[in-house]
Structure formats: C-alpha cells, structure tokens
Amino acid sequence: MARHRNVRGYNYDEDFEDDDLYGQSVEDDYCISPSTAAQFIYSRRDNPEEEYGYEDLRESSNSLLNHQLSEIDQARLYSCLDHMREVLGDAVPDDILTEAILKHKFDVQKALSVVLEQDGVQPWKEKSERAVCAGQPSKGKSVISRSSQSESEIVPKVAKMTVSGKKQTMGFEVPGLTSEENGLSVRAPHKGPPGDDVSVASPNIPETGTPKSALPPPSLQTSEELGSTPTPVRKSGKLRQQIDVKAELEKRQGGKQLLNLVVIGHVDAGKSTLMGHMLYLLGNVNKRTMHKYEQESKKAGKASFAYAWVLDETGEERERGVTMDVGMTKFETTTKVITLMDAPGHKDFIPNMITGAAQADVAVLVVDASRGEFEAGFETGGQTREHGLLVRSLGVTQLAVAVNKMDQVNWQQERFQEITGKLGHFLKQAGFKESDVAFIPTSGLSGENLTARSQSSDLTTWYKGMCLLEQIDSFKPPQRSIDKPFRLCVSDVFKDQGSGFCVTGKIEAGYIQTGDRLLAMPPNETCTAKGITLHDEPVDWAAAGDHVNLTLVGMDIIKINVGCIFCGPKEPIKACTRFRARILVFNIEVPITKGFPVLLHYQTVSEPAVIKRLISVLNKSTGEVTKKKPKLLTKGQNALVELQTQRPVALELYKDFKELGRFMLRYGGSTVAAGVVTEIKE
C-alpha cells in the first residue's frame, strides 16, 4: 500500500539535520532585512549578561538600614517601589529609587521624573573593597561590606552566643569577635571610626590566598570581660508608631464632617441624571468630560442621558439606560464631605440597592412628578414603596424627597402637594418622623433648584424652601462607633498593581492604621493592611464611617469574597449558620411557615436561608409574647424566629452593633420581612 511505503521509506535524517538555536527567535539562514530584524526579532547576543557580585546582593538586601523609617513609612516606601519597578524594571537599583522616593517625600511622580532625567540609566554595580581578616594582608579574594558608624548604631551586629564558665548570655554585641564555623569567617565591628570593616568569607566562594592555618586562632571573650561595655540588645518584632486616631478624627471633623448618602427611587425617576447634573454644577465634572458625554449620548440616540453617564460608567448601563450597580463618588458641601452612592431602581437589582442602602447614613428619595409615572412607582409593584421600607429598615432615619421632573408639569403647586400628601402619609407609616423628611421640587435635566435656589417665577411664587444641596448640607451625621472593635464589610475585591490585593468597603466600627493585623471572617484567615486609600488618596488611618480601599498582604485573594467582614484578631466577629432574630413581616401573599425558603440580605451578603422555627409572635409596641409556637406568620406581624443559612455568615447582635445587626429577607423577587439579630447559635 502506498501510504505504508511512504512511512517505511521516510528519511528521518532530514529532521535532525539542522541544529536548534534556542537563543534566537529566527534562524540566521532566513532572508530578512536588518530594519525588520531590529524591530521584530529578539537576539540574545545584543543583550550581554551582566555579572553581579555577591556583595551587590548583600548590600541591596540591606539598602534600607541607613534610613530610620517607621513601619508605616516602610509600607509606603515598598508601595512606591512597586509602582516605580513597573515603569523602570530592573535597570535601576533599589538604593537609587529609595533615595529618590525619600528625597521627594513618597511622591512617585517626582521621584520617577528625577530618575528618568538622569543621562543614560545603566545597571548599577558597586565595586567592592578588599579587606583582610584579622588585620593581616591576604592574596585571596574575600567579600567585604562597608558599614558606617550611623548604620552600626541603628542595627548593631549581634554575636550568636557568648559562653562563660558560669552562665550563658545571648544577644550581646562582641567587639572584635572573630569566629569560624564551617569555613565561614565573621568579624563583628565595634563602635569606632567609620573606617572599621566587616569581613565575610563565604564557603561558597573559592579562596586561593592564605590558607586557614596561616590565620591567627580565634579568641573568645567571656561575658565578664565584656561587662564594662554597654551593649544595646535588639528587640524581637518591630515597634510601630501609633496614631492617636481620636485626636486626628477631631481635627478632621473640625473642618468638614463625613456623611454617606444613598440615592433611591423607582426606575426612570431620574436619579442618575439628577445627581450627575449636581456634580457637574459643583465642578466635580469638567466641561471637557461633560461635552464628551453629550456627544456620545447623542450618537447613541439618548441625548437626555448625558448627565446620567457621569455615574453610569459601564457600557451595559449606558446601553440599557438603567443603573445596575451602585455608583460611588464624592462631593463637598459647605460643612460636609458627602460620599454619594447612586443605587439602581430596577426591581431586578434590588440586592445591589440593599448593599448601597446598608452603607448609608441618610437618603434622597427621587420620585417622578409626571402624570402616571408617580402613580406607577408608588402603587403595588412599584419600587418607591419598597425602597422607602428598605432604607428605614436598614437604619436610615433622615430622608430628602426630590420631586423630580417638575418642569414637565409646569411647576404646578397642586401636583407637588398631591405627591407630598400621598408620600408623606406612607413614610410616616414606614417609621419616618415628619421633622426628618423634607420635600423639594427639582428638575434634574434643567438643573433647577439643585445647587442654588430657583429663580424661575413659576416656582418661586409658591416655594420658598431650600434647594437640594442645602437640604443635604443640613443633614445631621450619626454618631460613629469609634470605641468599638474594628469591623469592615467587604463590598468589592480586586487585584491591584503591585503586591497583595485590594478590598473595598465601609468601616462600620472602630478604626484601622497602616500595618495593622486583620482577621477575615468567615474564612478565618489573617493578613496585614499594607495601605489605606480614602477618596483616592493614601492615608495612614481611617475610622468608622469611611469608605476605604485596603491593600492587603499575607493572604490569598481566592479566600476572600464579597460579604466577608474584617475585624481585629483579638476581638473577632462570630460566624454561624443558625441564629435567632426578631422580624417584621411586610405585605406578603403567601404566609411564612416552618421551612419557608428565603434569601438573606445582610450588608453586602446575599445568602440562601431557611426559617427553621417559628418561636413566638410578639407585640409590636411592647415586645411581649402574644402567641407561642405559631403555625404561620401573616403580613404585619412581629415574630421571633430561628433561621439557618447554607454557609457560615459573620453576624453581630443588634444590641452590640446596630449597624451589623440588621438584615432583610426576600422571596420571589420581593421583600417579605426585615429583622434584627437577637441571638447567635454556635
């Protein structure tokens, strides 16, 4: 058969005829122009290998000994080095980068400019100096490192052990001590002029000079002979400069107070457009960017969405015209720094809205004043009612109602009063005080009554109140739980440039400093906070109420999920799968019974759960037990139940941490109950 003959008669020598050249991308036999080769072909011959001495490795590892840096500054220095390494690679040694960073006070951009401006950046290699062990000349090669007097004072050389006839003392500095062990000759320096040398002869480096027998024998000094020389002992562990967070917080609050604001409302009520236009009027968005959004939205056929694109940054949100995730930004008023969270209004993204509302202190409820639109959002099935109940159940007590799109009804006072009457009655039933609710007529597209009081005669004839920005500025910030143990709930996890990874979240209680050890629950893993970023600026500390980014090292990113809680290792949060809670049942169609499946929303956690027991029905006002072991729960009832989750969830009791003791229960796309944790089962 022909194919068999082809196989049997195959000449394999042709396959092994040519040698493989692994050092080049393309063999030299190919015809290629020099310009093309220089642009696309890599040649190892054009990049000669560099020889590095053993002393370079030792000196680069000890390059920071000449600088007295706190642990916080060291973390900042390492972070700056990581960023500079991504730009420069390994062409510049760490010593030069360190000097540039310290000279410019950790400003990476200035340090990079100085290093790049140097003519001809070449790989750095410091020439070693030759020294003779025990003060005698030697022809052999030895590795020598130079230490100055200041360096020896910062990190004293410590001998391993000094043996006397009576006792053993460890960790004392031994001036002039020379010891040999397995061919390693070490001479410890004593405090003297900067010319003193330390000779280290490694057994891995061959010696061709004076043999070991020609050197004088080592002399050991007892601890009694060294008693007259005071010697510092290096402590184990690093001393970190502690920051008085309470004092620093008072200084910060002496300027402007921090407030977390969430914007809620029915879908297409104009939430993103309203806040995007406000940010533009406040100067947080420049004219060039705004002009770009206007042109892009016109091309997409959505000219009215230009201001909404300030907060809706993803392509899918802009294409669909609805907010899907919580958009976060910052702006300032006269007396406050506001962290703005734009929550989605579509019912499919209620879990994301709960995540944003759980991190908020106050809220702005946006309603559409157009005929039929307000009624659609307010009636059964609309999100205006559900959002109002959710934020109140999650602890928000102050609310500003922005009656939006008033220009479409010609700023009619009758329409405004109709909306405020219906909505005010509902909010009072939901638990809001009348004094904590304010109604403001606005227009997000035209910008009327947002940052300044309207000058339109149609509005000023009957409305004399504050604009939306003034109302936000008048909100009272809540008391922060600074004295309680540290708690941070993770809302996002991502891999940043450099070492470690980053988590985003709001500090619910306590405070944190750079370099603190943290415990993640429920994974029960420890890590170290390498860096803290607040409002895109690196800081040394952060306290309760701050939305921060933490750069963490010492832990695998795969072990951290959204919903994990970071705490202090000494005061950890409890993780459990069974707990008891007091719940308030909302308007539901199907009664809640034993074994009822629900979706537990707790902070940023969304976990399937089952109601294991119906313990009792409670009185709404007094909390007294009115019925034990009920068969079912109907709408409006207050009850004590026991829930079980599929996976462990980190919880706190409501009486200890109000911020971390609230949760929501959803079933079939609607919220069925809100509750607080009363007991945690092990």
Swiss-Prot record:
InterPro entries: EFTu-like_2, GTP-eEF1A_C, HBS1-like_N, HBS1-like_N_sf, P-loop_NTPase, T_Tr_GTP-bd_dom, TRAFAC_GTPase_members, Transl_B-barrel_sf. Detected in embryos. Its EC number is 3.6.5.-. Residues 342-345 are annotated as: G3. Residues 201-211, 220-231 have a biased composition (Polar residues). GO terms for cellular component: cytosolic ribosome; Dom34-Hbs1 complex. The keyword Hydrolase applies. Residues 265-272 are annotated as: G1. The keyword Zinc does not apply. It catalyses: GTP + H2O = GDP + phosphate + H(+). GO terms for biological process: nuclear-transcribed mRNA catabolic process, no-go decay; regulation of translation; rescue of stalled ribosome; ribosome disassembly. Disruption phenotype: Embryonic lethality; embryos fail to develop after 8.5 dpc. Conditional deletion in the in the developing cerebellum and midbrain leads to severe development defects in the cerebellum characterized by the absence of multiple cell types. In contrast, conditional deletion in the adult cerebellum and midbrain does not cause defects in neuron survival. Defects are probably caused by ribosome pausing, due to inability to rescue stalled ribosomes. The modification N6-acetyllysine is found at residue 620. Transmembrane segments: none annotated. Residues 142-154 have a biased composition (Low complexity). GTPase component of the Pelota-HBS1L complex, a complex that recognizes stalled ribosomes and triggers the No-Go Decay (NGD) pathway. The Pelota-HBS1L complex recognizes ribosomes stalled at the 3' end of an mRNA and engages stalled ribosomes by destabilizing mRNA in the mRNA channel. Following mRNA extraction from stalled ribosomes by the SKI complex, the Pelota-HBS1L complex promotes recruitment of ABCE1, which drives the disassembly of stalled ribosomes, followed by degradation of damaged mRNAs as part of the NGD pathway. This is HBS1-like protein.
